C-alpha cells in the first residue's frame, strides 16, 4: 500500500496531466477517494523508489517508513503469488451455514467444559484432603501407641521402628469466599433437568 505522501503526489500528477489547476487538484485529490468510477486493474508500477525531490517532501516518519519498507513494495507481485487470496474467483464470501448451528451449541459446550474443569479441580482437592487426613490420623495413632507403652525403653524402641511422624500442613483455600460461593452455585445449577451432585 503506498504511503500517504506518494499517493497524494500521484493524484496531483494525474490531475495536473489532465489539465486541472493546482488548487483544483488538491481538492480533487481529497474527494477522489470517495468517487466511484472504473478501478484501474494495472499492476502497481515499480515507481515506489521516489525521486530525491519527492523523498525530501515526505514527512520524516513517512520517509523513514519508505526507506525501510520500499524493497517489499517492489516485490508486491511476488508476495501476491506466494500468498494467494482464498477466494480469488468469488467477488463475495458466502458464510457457511454450518457455522450458524455450531454457534448455537457453543455456549452449552463451553459451560459443560467449564463444569468438567471445576469438577476435576474439586475432585483433586478432595483426594488431596483425604491424603492429608490419612497422614494426620496415622501420625496421631503412632503418637498414641508410643504414649501407651509401659516403659520408656519400649516407647523408644517402638518409635525407632515406626515411620517418622509427619506434621500435617493445612492447605490454604485458593478461592476466596466470593469465588467459592460462585463455584458452588455453578455446581448446583440445573442443566438439562440434571442437578450436578457436589
UniProtKB/Swiss-Prot annotation:
Q: Give the start-end ranges of region Disordered.
A: 1-47
Do you know which InterPro entries this protein is assigned to? LKAAEAR1 (IPR029152)
Per the UniProt record, one Pfam family is LKAAEAR
PANTHER family with a match to the protein in the record: PROTEIN LKAAEAR1 (PTHR35665:SF1)
**Gly residues: bias regions:** 20-30
What's the protein called, per UniProt? Protein LKAAEAR1
Amino acid at each position: 500500500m503506498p504511503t500517504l505522501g506518494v499517493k497524494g503526489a500521484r493524484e496531483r500528477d494525474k490531475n495536473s496531466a489532465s489539465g486541472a489547476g493546482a488548487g483544483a487538484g488538491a481538492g480533487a485529490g481529497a474527494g477522489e477517494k470517495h468517487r466511484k468510477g472504473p478501478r484501474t486493474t494495472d499492476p502497481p508500477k515499480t515507481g515506489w523508489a521516489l525521486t530525491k525531490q519527492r523523498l525530501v517532501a515526505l514527512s520524516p516518519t513517512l520517509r523513514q517508513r519508505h526507506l525501510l519498507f520500499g524493497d517489499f513494495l517492489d516485490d508486491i507481485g511476488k508476495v501476491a503469488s506466494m500468498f494467494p487470496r482464498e477466494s480469488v474467483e468469488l467477488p463475495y464470501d458466502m458464510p457457511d451455514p454450518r457455522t450458524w448451528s455450531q454457534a448455537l451449541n457453543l455456549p452449552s459446550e463451553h459451560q459443560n467444559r467449564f463444569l468438567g474443569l471445576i469438577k476435576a479441580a474439586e475432585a483433586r482437592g478432595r483426594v488431596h484432603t483425604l491424603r492429608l487426613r490419612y497422614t494426620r490420623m496415622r501420625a496421631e495413632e503412632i503418637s498414641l501407641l508410643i504414649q501407651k507403652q509401659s516403659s520408656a525403653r519400649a516407647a523408644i524402641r517402638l518409635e525407632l521402628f515406626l515411620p517418622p511422624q509427619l506434621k500435617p500442613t493445612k492447605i490454604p483455600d485458593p478461592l476466596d469466599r466470593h469465588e467459592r460461593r460462585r463455584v458452588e452455585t455453578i455446581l448446583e445449577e440445573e442443566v438439562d433437568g440434571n442437578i450436578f451432585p457436589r
